[in-house]
């Protein structure tokens, strides 16, 4: 069996490019495979294929990532995103599939706090429907690998500055909470680009 190695991916937890493709099952050992194992371009996942099975391994921090995260397809039920600080414009994004439908609610404001989740929010909320792109939106969101991010990214050398928060609940009950202060995870720009792809302004 010929071993195909994809370009090395960035670890979504530590940002290292020293990653390897996970090869599951019982491949025939060849000199080509042994060379890739020695170079840590490939790691063996084991003869029993895990479900769900990650596709990549980080040689730096040991994190396995990629592939399907759930045994059955799961879609976003609720999403809350915030980025901002005491100075400049803050941004809020909210989605609640059961309460508001497949619609992204978005606010940009100089205010320090806006309850974007409330129907009575006293602000100008932009509504961006994504009902016809729902499956694609969920797929693109997962490709930001936020499930693999650390729970907190903190730069202790900056007191004020910019804070951000991402909370996502899936329809299978899984909830992911991520937070940062003046520090950002790998694939952060990819997340911002994903929101822009579905009709939101570019968040800087």
Per-range role (PLM):
Residues 14, 59-62:
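Short Cys/His-rich metal-coordination motifs, predominantly Zn2+-binding knuckles/fingers
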Residues 182-197:
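Short, surface-exposed linear segments at secondary-structure transitions and domain or protein termini
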